[in-house]
């Protein structure tokens, strides 16, 4: 049991596992924010613009009794599609920004040593040649 706990401790303390855990927590919170944005802000305004429609009430009745109809709730589906598109766009922007930063780091020219270091290196080389 102790070996199992030690192995788990090593696993959880590695960077990848911690990064994944942080990503999952932040992703879950971000998903809730986007869902609220779509349900509470975006779709009501969009519904108002297209004629006072509430997306939550958009249903297609396909059968059943009038008291208990069988419905396809395509308004809720549209809200989920809006959620997905907004989250996918946000992730795209994040990945694009990270890739741009990585490219800038890769493209940066090698830095030259300061003039003092160059001078000291030359002096060292001269002294080495004279001592031989």
From Swiss-Prot:
Q: Which GO terms describe its cellular component?
A: plasma membrane
Which InterPro entries does this entry report, sorted A to Z?
A: MS_channel, MSC/AndL, MscL_channel
The UniProt keywords, alphabetically, are: Cell inner membrane, Cell membrane, Ion channel, Ion transport, Membrane, Transmembrane, Transmembrane helix, Transport
Q: How does it sit in the membrane?
A: Multi-pass membrane protein
Query: Which Gene3D superfamilies does this chain map to?
Result: Large-conductance mechanosensitive channel, MscL, domain 1
Annotated localization: Cell inner membrane
Could you name the domain of life of the organism this protein comes from? Bacteria
Q: Which GO terms describe its molecular function?
A: mechanosensitive monoatomic ion channel activity
Instruction: Tell me which Pfam families the record gives.
Output: MscL
* Residue spans crossing the bilayer: 11-31, 75-95
Q: What does this protein do?
A: Channel that opens in response to stretch forces in the membrane lipid bilayer. May participate in the regulation of osmotic pressure changes within the cell.
UniProt similarity note:
Belongs to the MscL family.
Quaternary organization? Homopentamer.
Q: What is this protein called?
A: Large-conductance mechanosensitive channel
Organism whose genome encodes this protein: Synechococcus sp. (strain JA-3-3Ab) (Cyanobacteria bacterium Yellowstone A-Prime)
Instruction: Tell me what gene encodes this.
Output: mscL
